[in-house]
């Protein structure tokens, strides 16, 4: 689809640096409908080499990612990615903080209470020790 059009504080965002993940808002510029979600920059893969299991970090598909919402992805396919704005709201240094801030944004914006949002679910399980702002 599109290589990368994520913005952070109004500027193009291209390199994750030391960050683990981000919380984002995607806006349909024609209808105004939005989606709040999260995405991790990295994942850990395992590979067996000479009977030894090794772990290594690989970059995710975050540059091309359009959310887990099937309705949103269908709209992107139908009207095209140029009619959407992809904004990074929070850059996070660990998984727990990413999960917490996604849920916080979803509750603060009341995404389940209006049809102005693509969001259909809020799922989170975060322990206090995992949240490190």
Description of each model-found segment:
Residues 1-133:
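Structure-specific nucleic-acid interaction/processing domains
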């Amino acid at each position: 689809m599109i290589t990368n059009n994520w913005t952070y504080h109004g500027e193009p965002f291209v390199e994750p640096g030391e960050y683990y993940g981000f919380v984002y808002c995607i806006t349909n510029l024609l209808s105004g409908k939005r989606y709040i979600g999260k995405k991790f920059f990295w994942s850990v893969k395992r590979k067996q080499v000479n009977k030894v299991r090794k772990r290594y970090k690989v970059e995710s598909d975050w540059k091309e990612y359009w959310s887990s919402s099937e309705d949103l992805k269908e709209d992107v396919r139908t009207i095209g990615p140029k009619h959407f704005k992809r904004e990074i709201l929070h850059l996070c240094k660990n998984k727990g903080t990413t999960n917490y801030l996604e849920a916080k944004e979803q509750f603060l914006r009341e995404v389940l209470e209006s049809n102005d949002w693509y969001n259909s679910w809020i799922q989170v399980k975060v322990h206090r020790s995992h949240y490190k702002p």
